[in-house]
Amino acid sequence: MGSSGLGKAATLDELLCTCIEMFDDNGELDNSYLPRIVLLMHRWYLSSTELAEKLLCMYRNATGESCNEFRLKICYFMRYWILKFPAEFNLDLGLIRMTEEFREVASQLGYEKHVSLIDISSIPSYDWMRRVTQRKKVSKKGKACLLFDHLEPIELAEHLTFLEHKSFRRISFTDYQSYVIHGCLENNPTLERSIALFNGISKWVQLMVLSKPTPQQRAEVITKFINVAKKLLQLKNFNTLMAVVGGLSHSSISRLKETHSHLSSEVTKNWNEMTELVSSNGNYCNYRKAFADCDGFKIPILGVHLKDLIAVHVIFPDWTEENKVNIVKMHQLSVTLSELVSLQNASHHLEPNMDLINLLTLSLDLYHTEDDIYKLSLVLEPRNSKSQPTSPTTPNKPVVPLEWALGVMPKPDPTVINKHIRKLVESVFRNYDHDHDGYISQEDFESIAANFPFLDSFCVLDKDQDGLISKDEMMAYFLRAKSQLHCKMGPGFIHNFQEMTYLKPTFCEHCAGFLWGIIKQGYKCKDCGANCHKQCKDLLVLACRRFARAPSLSSGHGSLPGSPSLPPAQDEVFEFPGVTAGHRDLDSRAITLVTGSSRKISVRLQRATTSQATQTEPVWSEAGWGDSGSHTFPKMKSKFHDKAAKDKGFAKWENEKPRVHAGVDVVDRGTEFELDQDEGEETRQDGEDG
């Protein structure tokens, strides 16, 4: 690292002096990485303004025969900072003021060369980095319809990659730092939006599959998404690859045994390979190897690298001894952060169709809950309790009628829900009301509906039958759907929360934020398995639905999902607590599936069902733990062995629990994130947005 004998700890002044002395009289730097590491990591210890102030004090107070030489090297160090991290000198007003003061002091001392070295007037604007939500520039020319059936996999992969990179490159050093230190997404909207995009892609994949009425058609959609995943891998977009594979591996899709029977062996083989690539086995060793073998433009699986940062932060203290920086920790953190920062600055050669980008952005802004999606899956292919599922990604375990508890949970705040609806309607009209007359034509509506599964027909929204949909009609439509969701909500239930340490990345079921961390990341309901932040547990609007538990693990038949083509191996099964069948007659009971529209699909249930197994919990039994249905990536192995093999776990990115029970409608608990709409600046990678 070129620490020049600093050892494992040093004061900030010692670090700065060492970095300054590494520049020669011509401003050239030797092969040491220390100056870059210090400039990258300094905000872990003090602000950029404070660092510039320290350098200015050293510049002013320089004395002795070599003071002129030392002052020149300080200016070389400042120039190096400006060249390597120009965005800081455009976005940080305190740093800008301090730099101008630095120039004034140098001018007063008669060092005109020094003044020219720290000139920041030519730095381009990085204002796009701090605009979390931007409006798109409405094009008056032509319209493009993102018809999923007609869009080639490479086109879809490229546009998803464009959205992913645009979200990824806005995440700043302080966003990473805030999450690693505080372990939450509070006051971190940029990172939160990146997570929302991942979730939106995963849910959209599931809904596009479930929007098809026949197993053959659903298999065709799965095949297309597998081809999209292959193209994403070619584009080196690992984060979206994980979202797509995760959506296909979700229990709502993996349980569709009739659909899986229509998949070709080649598709299944490709699915196996993609699933293995994102496996968490060996600390994501397959992904890490593939990622390291790539060069140039690539998008990492952000969660994996954030976990690396958290691990270093927990193990090493920031300071050792008195007022000394832990250089070992600083170096370890810089390895990951330096790579993330450099990848954000990498340019791509994508040429997206901005109309498709805008429509795809809206398509990913979904309001369907995990309950909605899983119930729709059951409607399309009802569960057969007498047969083992042929889809190897589907656990099969006994279930129990839900046990209702006492107590009342407050209803969702209508003000918040209405705000979400207004944002959705505004977003639609902002993108499709091209002449700004307050109406959307049937042609524009068909462009929208092609990518929003289960949206009602045009005539349903067009209440006055004038051939146009007004903003009021669309508002009334969604408000009516919302009221139908709430009118039959019935009593809520008090959760029995317990502070938990999670073994896998997990989502808060209230705010959709990550519960990542090392220990005690959040709270889990001992009765229903709901997970949330400490600050969210009193705000959670979700019924507590208990299920009975068997006294031992031996009666459980569930297993973590396997490869899409292989039956579960008996020597690799994680067993979960079994449950006993209830005695209530549910023949007369029914559920009503409320999708994103007001349309309902009623289905009779022979028995209540619970969701699939999850990897959120450890494999051992713990009294009071409920199983939790969630988005998991399948465990898989390429070969079968008679002897027990090492289990392979997979990253879990969503933790909204799908549950089905008799006589209760869906409660919408989705969190709305308004995705970015302005693409104009982002297409110029080397221009004004850097």
UniProtKB/Swiss-Prot annotation:
<keyword id="KW-0479">Metal-binding</keyword>
<dbReference type="InterPro" id="IPR000651">
    <property type="entry name" value="Ras-like_Gua-exchang_fac_N"/>
</dbReference>
<feature type="binding site">
    <location>
        <position position="466"/>
    </location>
    <ligand>
        <name>Ca(2+) 2</name>
    </ligand>
</feature>
<feature type="binding site">
    <location>
        <position position="464"/>
    </location>
    <ligand>
        <name>Ca(2+) 2</name>
    </ligand>
</feature>
<comment type="similarity">
    <text>Belongs to the RASGRP family.</text>
</comment>
<feature type="domain" description="EF-hand 1">
    <location>
        <begin position="420"/>
        <end position="455"/>
    </location>
</feature>
<dbReference type="InterPro" id="IPR023578">
    <property type="entry name" value="Ras_GEF_dom_sf"/>
</dbReference>
<dbReference type="InterPro" id="IPR018247">
    <property type="entry name" value="EF_Hand_1_Ca_BS"/>
</dbReference>
<dbReference type="GO" id="GO:0005085">
    <property type="term" value="F:guanyl-nucleotide exchange factor activity"/>
</dbReference>
<dbReference type="GO" id="GO:0019900">
    <property type="term" value="F:kinase binding"/>
</dbReference>
<feature type="binding site">
    <location>
        <position position="473"/>
    </location>
    <ligand>
        <name>Ca(2+) 2</name>
    </ligand>
</feature>
<dbReference type="GO" id="GO:0000165">
    <property type="term" value="P:MAPK cascade"/>
</dbReference>
<dbReference type="GO" id="GO:0005509">
    <property type="term" value="F:calcium ion binding"/>
</dbReference>
<dbReference type="Pfam" id="PF00130">
    <property type="entry name" value="C1_1"/>
</dbReference>
<dbReference type="InterPro" id="IPR020454">
    <property type="entry name" value="DAG/PE-bd"/>
</dbReference>
<dbReference type="InterPro" id="IPR001895">
    <property type="entry name" value="RASGEF_cat_dom"/>
</dbReference>
<dbReference type="GO" id="GO:0005886">
    <property type="term" value="C:plasma membrane"/>
</dbReference>
<feature type="binding site">
    <location>
        <position position="444"/>
    </location>
    <ligand>
        <name>Ca(2+) 1</name>
    </ligand>
</feature>
<feature type="domain" description="N-terminal Ras-GEF">
    <location>
        <begin position="3"/>
        <end position="125"/>
    </location>
</feature>
<feature type="binding site">
    <location>
        <position position="437"/>
    </location>
    <ligand>
        <name>Ca(2+) 1</name>
    </ligand>
</feature>
<dbReference type="GO" id="GO:0008270">
    <property type="term" value="F:zinc ion binding"/>
</dbReference>
<dbReference type="GO" id="GO:0031267">
    <property type="term" value="F:small GTPase binding"/>
</dbReference>
<dbReference type="InterPro" id="IPR036964">
    <property type="entry name" value="RASGEF_cat_dom_sf"/>
</dbReference>
<feature type="domain" description="EF-hand 2">
    <location>
        <begin position="458"/>
        <end position="484"/>
    </location>
</feature>
<keyword id="KW-0677">Repeat</keyword>
<keyword id="KW-0344">Guanine-nucleotide releasing factor</keyword>
<feature type="binding site">
    <location>
        <position position="435"/>
    </location>
    <ligand>
        <name>Ca(2+) 1</name>
    </ligand>
</feature>
<feature type="zinc finger region" description="Phorbol-ester/DAG-type">
    <location>
        <begin position="494"/>
        <end position="544"/>
    </location>
</feature>
<dbReference type="InterPro" id="IPR046349">
    <property type="entry name" value="C1-like_sf"/>
</dbReference>
<dbReference type="GO" id="GO:0005096">
    <property type="term" value="F:GTPase activator activity"/>
</dbReference>
<keyword id="KW-0863">Zinc-finger</keyword>
<dbReference type="GO" id="GO:0032045">
    <property type="term" value="C:guanyl-nucleotide exchange factor complex"/>
</dbReference>
<feature type="binding site">
    <location>
        <position position="462"/>
    </location>
    <ligand>
        <name>Ca(2+) 2</name>
    </ligand>
</feature>
<protein>
    <recommendedName>
        <fullName>Ras guanyl-releasing protein 3</fullName>
    </recommendedName>
</protein>
<feature type="region of interest" description="Disordered">
    <location>
        <begin position="667"/>
        <end position="690"/>
    </location>
</feature>
<feature type="binding site">
    <location>
        <position position="433"/>
    </location>
    <ligand>
        <name>Ca(2+) 1</name>
    </ligand>
</feature>
<dbReference type="GO" id="GO:0019992">
    <property type="term" value="F:diacylglycerol binding"/>
</dbReference>
<feature type="domain" description="Ras-GEF">
    <location>
        <begin position="152"/>
        <end position="383"/>
    </location>
</feature>
<dbReference type="InterPro" id="IPR008937">
    <property type="entry name" value="Ras-like_GEF"/>
</dbReference>
<dbReference type="InterPro" id="IPR002048">
    <property type="entry name" value="EF_hand_dom"/>
</dbReference>
<dbReference type="InterPro" id="IPR011992">
    <property type="entry name" value="EF-hand-dom_pair"/>
</dbReference>
<keyword id="KW-0862">Zinc</keyword>
